[in-house]
Amino acid sequence: MKIRVGINGFGRMGRLALRAAWGWPELEFVHINEIKGGAVAAAHLLKFDSVHGRWTPEVEAEGERVLIDSTPLSFSEYGKPEDVPWEDFGVDLVLECSGKFRTPATLDPYFKRGVQKVIVAAPVKEEALNIVMGVNDYLYEPEKHHLLTAASCTTNCLAPVVKVIHEGLGIKHGIITTIHDNTNTQTLVDAPHKDLRRARATSLSLIPTTTGSATAIALIYPELKGKLNGIAVRVPLLNASLTDCVFEVNRPTTVEEINALLKAASEQAPLQGILGYEERPLVSIDYKDDPRSSIIDALSTMVVDETQVKILAWYDNEWGYVNRMVELARKVALSLK
């Protein structure tokens, strides 16, 4: 038995989530809601992607539908979740990928429209189950949790590293810097923006800005609340990104021990296929289309004065993230059968 899935917001995350999920037997995609461009633009951008290339299935628009290998998905252009007749399409699960609705109050209309579960492709600002696959997905209780967030791409990169180091050595405190690719929250040329640095042209500068990824770790490890913080630096690339982690740990360690812990974790459950480990001298482009959330650059691991640790972790901030979101959707789907 499949569950019926709808997508709200067919931008970067919505389109790539559909690509990553297409063909999984638990998920039947039936509806797309996107306010810009109509079905023609949706079909075209699903098929052709400047970063991730041409998608293998045949994709076309036919009236108010998108056809994928002749399978029809209905299409609408409503501005608010409450305006979409999700119940008419029999939608059980919505992937909320618009980036606009991030509080329980703005997400509650889905449930009033008959949707059983909602997974948000962004952090939710208030109470919602914050899931990082491989780290705390065991917390999901089908009868209790209906609104879930798949956290952020950077949190999905950082959390596996924190899990291994905190459980293996103990983390006193730390500072995180994510070297992050451009996103649509920035501007191509200078334009007004509430963040004056993001107001500047993306292709001409390295742009320091905020990230909540480090503080979000406290939702998973409450004992680290107030002990981790971080910053993002947006760079003029489209893919992939890098997280620079600096921790003070509880006991003396070595580069060899750090790398051994991370390598071992990457080879067994629950982080196998989520955490990677790489000893070759690779660069960011080599991680484009990598479905893992976090890949350790073992050559860059450092230890200073026995307890200060530096770890670099690569991630495809789009493809890695949507693969975890789809894994969460499959977990939810199995709970609804």
From Swiss-Prot:
Q: EC number(s) of the enzyme?
A: 1.2.1.12
Q: Which InterPro entries match?
A: G3PDH_Arsen (IPR054835), GAP_dehydrogenase (IPR052978), GlycerAld/Erythrose_P_DH (IPR020831), GlycerAld_3-P_DH_AS (IPR020830), GlycerAld_3-P_DH_cat (IPR020829), GlycerAld_3-P_DH_NAD(P)-bd (IPR020828), Glyceraldehyde-3-P_DH_1 (IPR006424), NAD(P)-bd_dom_sf (IPR036291)
The GO terms describing molecular function are:
glyceraldehyde-3-phosphate dehydrogenase (NAD+) (phosphorylating) activity; NAD binding; NADP binding
- What positions constitute the catalytic site? 153 (nucleophile)
Descriptive protein name:
Glyceraldehyde-3-phosphate dehydrogenase 3
Q: Where does D-glyceraldehyde 3-phosphate bind?
A: 152-154, 183, 198, 211-212, 234
A Gene Ontology biological process in which this protein takes part is: glycolytic process
- Asked if the keyword DNA-binding belongs to this entry, the reply reads no
Q: By its UniProt entry, which SUPFAM superfamilies does this protein fall under? A: Glyceraldehyde-3-phosphate dehydrogenase-like, C-terminal domain, NAD(P)-binding Rossmann-fold domains
NCBIfam families for the chain: G3PDH_Arsen, GAPDH-I
Query: Which family would the database say this protein is a member of?
Result: Belongs to the glyceraldehyde-3-phosphate dehydrogenase family.
Q: What is its main location?
A: cytoplasm
Name of the top EC class for this enzyme: oxidoreductase
CDD domains xrefs = GAPDH_I_C, GAPDH_I_N
Where is it located?
A: Cytoplasm
Q: Name one GO cellular component term.
A: cytoplasm
Alphabetized UniProt keyword annotations: Cytoplasm, Gluconeogenesis, Glycolysis, NAD, Nucleotide-binding, Oxidoreductase
Tell me how this protein assembles.
Answer: Homotetramer.
Known catalysed reaction(s)? Answer: D-glyceraldehyde 3-phosphate + phosphate + NAD(+) = (2R)-3-phospho-glyceroyl phosphate + NADH + H(+)
Name the lineage: Bacteria, Bacillati, Cyanobacteriota, Cyanophyceae, Nostocales
The source organism is Trichormus variabilis (strain ATCC 29413 / PCC 7937)
The site (Activates thiol group during catalysis) lies at: 180
Q: What job does the chain carry out?
A: Catalyzes the oxidative phosphorylation of glyceraldehyde 3-phosphate (G3P) to 1,3-bisphosphoglycerate (BPG) using the cofactor NAD. The first reaction step involves the formation of a hemiacetal intermediate between G3P and a cysteine residue, and this hemiacetal intermediate is then oxidized to a thioester, with concomitant reduction of NAD to NADH. The reduced NADH is then exchanged with the second NAD, and the thioester is attacked by a nucleophilic inorganic phosphate to produce BPG.
Q: In which pathway does it act?
A: Carbohydrate degradation; glycolysis; pyruvate from D-glyceraldehyde 3-phosphate: step 1/5; Carbohydrate biosynthesis; gluconeogenesis
